[in-house]
């Protein structure tokens, strides 16, 4: 297959990085499968096309179809770093409004996050929490537990993305998981706290991710009930 895909989430934005060709066959099928996974939980998707060398009419039709579906849910599909040939195609077909392009991935992500920060801030139902850990599954688990208790949770597996989230909107809690790639937990805490100095800082214990789900849930809830600078 001539296409490789890499995905992650930044808060409530799902990011798909594409490298290669998006054309009829296995490539389009692979991208559609990734979009199907994304839309199960996310309505806002960023597609990074900066390293895409070809995109045929079938692929464009796929993007339009998902842009329409996501738009009906209040979200959308936005393109990051589209090559000149894609930009030209969007302008020729008058699709640039439905599939807006941004110079960089960060710009596309921020376009969604700033939209949240402005128009939807009044809809928050509880304290804000930023969760950072390299495990997407752990982030989903923590987000599910805390959201069910009334917290407004954003999570990410990327340190860079965590800083983007804090740069757009502050938080009441910073929750750092046991797995922080390339950086020590202490460095992560110091860097993120500098961006949101009033936030309560919480750290999961090193064995948190291997605990029984019930035990982990109890520890998580106890940690949030015990105040600042706690560890579960």
Where are the language model's segments positioned?
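Non-catalytic signal-transmission and effector/linker regions of two-component phosphorelay proteins
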Residues: 1-10, 106-128, 208-232
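STAS-typified acidic loop motif
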Residues: 2-36
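Acidic catalytic/metal-coordinating carboxylates
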Residues: 158, 184-187
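Active-site beta3 strand of CheY-like receiver
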Residues: 54, 170-180
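Conserved acidic segment of CheY-like receiver
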Residues: 126-136, 142-146, 174
């Amino acid at each position: 297959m001539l296409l490789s895909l890499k995905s992650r989430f930044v808060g409530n934005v799902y990011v798909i990085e594409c490298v290669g060709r998006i054309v009829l066959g296995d490539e389009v099928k692979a991208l559609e499968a990734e979009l199907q996974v994304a839309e199960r939980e996310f309505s806002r998707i960023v597609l990074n096309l900066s390293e895409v060398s070809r995109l045929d009419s079938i692929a464009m039709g796929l993007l339009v179809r998902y842009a329409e579906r996501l738009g009906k849910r209040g979200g959308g599909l936005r393109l990051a770093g589209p090559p000149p040939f894609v930009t030209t195609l969007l302008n020729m077909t008058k699709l640039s409004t439905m599939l807006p392009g941004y110079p960089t991935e960060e710009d596309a992500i921020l376009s969604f996050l700033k939209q949240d920060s402005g128009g939807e801030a009044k809809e928050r139902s509880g304290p804000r929490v930023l969760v950072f850990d390299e495990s997407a599954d752990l982030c989903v688990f923590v987000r599910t537990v805390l959201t069910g208790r009334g917290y407004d949770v954003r999570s990410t597996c990327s340190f860079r993305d965590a800083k983007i989230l804090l740069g757009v909107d502050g938080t009441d809690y910073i929750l750092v998981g046991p797995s922080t790639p390339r950086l020590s937990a202490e460095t992560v805490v110091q860097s993120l706290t500098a961006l949101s100095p009033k936030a309560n800082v919480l750290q999961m214990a090193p064995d948190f991710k291997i605990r029984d789900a019930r035990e982990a849930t109890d520890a998580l809830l106890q940690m949030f009930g015990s105040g600042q600078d706690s560890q579960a």
